[in-house]
Amino acid sequence: MSNEVKKNEELIEKLVSVKRHSKTVKGGRIMSFAALTVVGDGKGRIGVGRGKSREVPAAIQKAMENAKKNMVSVNLNNDTLWYPVVSNHGASKVFMQPASAGTGIIAGGAMRSVFEAVGVHNVLAKTYGSTNPANVVRATIAGLAKIKSPDEIAEKRGLSVEEIQG
């Protein structure tokens, strides 16, 4: 369950979790492994993937390929967020807020992997409710995806950035 960090094609690949599954059949149990991975470019693109196989390396490889196919763009303010955001997925609820330079990533396991892969270096984050890694990762990515920059908000409201920021 440790994180694996590999630079491949300038992508940061993180292993979030590996679980063992078993299927009971007439002849006994069939074991398989499910992997959850996060892939990012460190510049605002992030993807999550799941893979399942009879062997751990094959499950991780499938999860990495799946994550690369499901990448989304995230709007960042240099190396932190624009404003605090709350998001949830299933019974997992995550709260993320920007932090000043030098703070680092103050977040739990699954969320930390997402922030490291997407390129956020200063953030404060907390998980409420379920800490299931799959739901926490999905909630974190959903929260990051719904963040808009002041430019986008100003354009949507028909105002200038100065009027919005006060």
Curated annotation (Swiss-Prot):
<dbReference type="GO" id="GO:0015935">
    <property type="term" value="C:small ribosomal subunit"/>
</dbReference>
<comment type="function">
    <text>Located at the back of the 30S subunit body where it stabilizes the conformation of the head with respect to the body.</text>
</comment>
<feature type="domain" description="S5 DRBM">
    <location>
        <begin position="11"/>
        <end position="74"/>
    </location>
</feature>
<dbReference type="InterPro" id="IPR005324">
    <property type="entry name" value="Ribosomal_uS5_C"/>
</dbReference>
<keyword id="KW-0689">Ribosomal protein</keyword>
<dbReference type="Pfam" id="PF00333">
    <property type="entry name" value="Ribosomal_S5"/>
</dbReference>
<dbReference type="InterPro" id="IPR013810">
    <property type="entry name" value="Ribosomal_uS5_N"/>
</dbReference>
<dbReference type="InterPro" id="IPR005712">
    <property type="entry name" value="Ribosomal_uS5_bac-type"/>
</dbReference>
<dbReference type="GO" id="GO:0019843">
    <property type="term" value="F:rRNA binding"/>
</dbReference>
<dbReference type="InterPro" id="IPR000851">
    <property type="entry name" value="Ribosomal_uS5"/>
</dbReference>
<dbReference type="InterPro" id="IPR014721">
    <property type="entry name" value="Ribsml_uS5_D2-typ_fold_subgr"/>
</dbReference>
<keyword id="KW-0694">RNA-binding</keyword>
<comment type="function">
    <text>With S4 and S12 plays an important role in translational accuracy.</text>
</comment>
<comment type="similarity">
    <text>Belongs to the universal ribosomal protein uS5 family.</text>
</comment>
<dbReference type="InterPro" id="IPR020568">
    <property type="entry name" value="Ribosomal_Su5_D2-typ_SF"/>
</dbReference>
<keyword id="KW-0687">Ribonucleoprotein</keyword>
<keyword id="KW-0699">rRNA-binding</keyword>
<dbReference type="InterPro" id="IPR018192">
    <property type="entry name" value="Ribosomal_uS5_N_CS"/>
</dbReference>
<dbReference type="GO" id="GO:0006412">
    <property type="term" value="P:translation"/>
</dbReference>
<dbReference type="GO" id="GO:0003735">
    <property type="term" value="F:structural constituent of ribosome"/>
</dbReference>
<comment type="subunit">
    <text>Part of the 30S ribosomal subunit. Contacts proteins S4 and S8.</text>
</comment>
<protein>
    <recommendedName>
        <fullName>Small ribosomal subunit protein uS5</fullName>
    </recommendedName>
</protein>
<dbReference type="Pfam" id="PF03719">
    <property type="entry name" value="Ribosomal_S5_C"/>
</dbReference>
